[in-house]
Amino acid sequence: MNNLQKQFPHISIKLNEPLSKYTYTKTGGNADIFVMPKSIEETQEIVSYCYQNTIPLTVLGNGSNLIIKDGGIRGVIVHLDLLQTIERKNTQIIAMSGAKLIDTAKFALGESLSGLEFACGIPGSIGGALHMNAGAYGGEISDVLEAATVLTPYGELKKLKRSELKAAYRFSTIAEKNYIVLDATFSLELEDKNIIQAKMDELTAARESKQPLEYPSCGSVFKRPPGHFAGKLIQDSGLQGHIIGGAQVSLKHAGFIVNIGNATATDYMNLIAHVQQTVREKFDVELETEVKIIGED
């Protein structure tokens, strides 16, 4: 820790930082070393230093589709929340990794650019969205993603073109190669602002009516199994409302697990395992987690 602070006195570095402050579930242990770079250059410095000194490094985005275990995370956490610039270039939008997806969709609306309406309610960061090819209501990030600037795990800066950014359902080249997203370029289309707003209002209303936004949660917990819907399988298994500790299968949407009061990451993990086992026994279907789970028990 002292070496890191001496090496980078210009960068915000905290010791034993509670990660529950940075996750939507309000759960998770502490980070040994918590770093918040203010620029691409600072991010590259930290990543290169950790690689050269064999220090474990984990990147944290908006913490919205994430469970951090109660034992926390060893090594260095790099939180990219300060990299939030969003700008327009012709009919393209360039957003930095820490920018919120919702804010980027609103920025596009303000510029009369269509294509990100589906993202108007997704509570993730640009970096996290690219990592998992986030999507909702028939749209995915890969539909509009033109290019991305990334860091390799050893700190090399790379520009990836659309053809290099292979993506599938909740999968991307970025995740496969463990790249760190620095910014993303989206190709959009000019459209009447009122038409864009109407579509966003429609999707927001649908989201509010179906999802348990009144409780802390990690968003959609499970991927959609082929030929099924995870929420329907969970509901038909009689698990809607099931509670372990402070974690509950949402009464509003069975595909969500909410924190109804002082839940721990262990509560979440135990409830996820119980749901998977029950659905497997009843329907012979494997539920694969969409939520990313990291850290130590």
From Swiss-Prot:
Its cofactor is FAD. Coiled coil: none annotated. Keywords: Cell cycle, Cell division, Cell shape, Cell wall biogenesis/degradation, Cytoplasm, FAD, Flavoprotein, NADP, Oxidoreductase, Peptidoglycan synthesis. Residues 27-191 form the FAD-binding PCMH-type domain. Gene3D superfamilies: 3.30.465.10, UDP-N-acetylenolpyruvoylglucosamine reductase, C-terminal domain, Uridine Diphospho-n-acetylenolpyruvylglucosamine Reductase, domain 2. The lineage of its organism: Bacteria, Bacillati, Bacillota, Bacilli, Bacillales. Cell wall formation. This is UDP-N-acetylenolpyruvoylglucosamine reductase. GO terms for cellular component: cytosol. GO terms for biological process: cell division; cell wall organization; peptidoglycan biosynthetic process; regulation of cell shape. It catalyses: UDP-N-acetyl-alpha-D-muramate + NADP(+) = UDP-N-acetyl-3-O-(1-carboxyvinyl)-alpha-D-glucosamine + NADPH + H(+). The active site is at residues 170, 220, 290. The gene is murB. Belongs to the MurB family. Pathway: Cell wall biogenesis; peptidoglycan biosynthesis.
